[in-house]
Amino acid sequence: MKIAIIVREETMLRCTGGGCLNAFFQRIDSFARYADREDVELVAFTHNGGDLEKKIATLKKKAVDVIHLSSCTRGKDPNYEALAQRLAEDFTVVGYTHGGEIGSTGPAIILEKAGKSPVTGSE
């Protein structure tokens, strides 16, 4: 299973990505769903700025299965829902990386790739 993490561009001006990467490598928080899998590979770590459609095309070429939106995107980006919906046209989307599935701004968006049934964070 191939994973990509998309973070908030403005946050990346001061963030090293440590929280997202720690959660991935420790298989905690949003990545706990993969704890029993050995085939999980992080193939991209990028921000939401720039040419999103070009990034989507590249992620599709890399055969990404799931995109995790960073927790800072959920908490601070007014386009969080629209971004998740657009990405769900081509990928399964998990709308947070570290911390709880239910954050201070509400529950994280969890979407299956378009055409599939919605999933919950516990699946």
Model segments located where?
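Structural motif
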Residues: 65-66
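Conserved mixed alpha/beta catalytic, RNA-binding, or beta-rich assembly cores of soluble enzyme
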Residues: 1-59, 70-80, 93-94, 99-123
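Short, aromatic/basic amphipathic alpha-helical patches
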Residues: 79-89
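Active-site charged/polar residues at nucleotide-handling catalytic sites that mediate phosphoryl
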Residues: 62
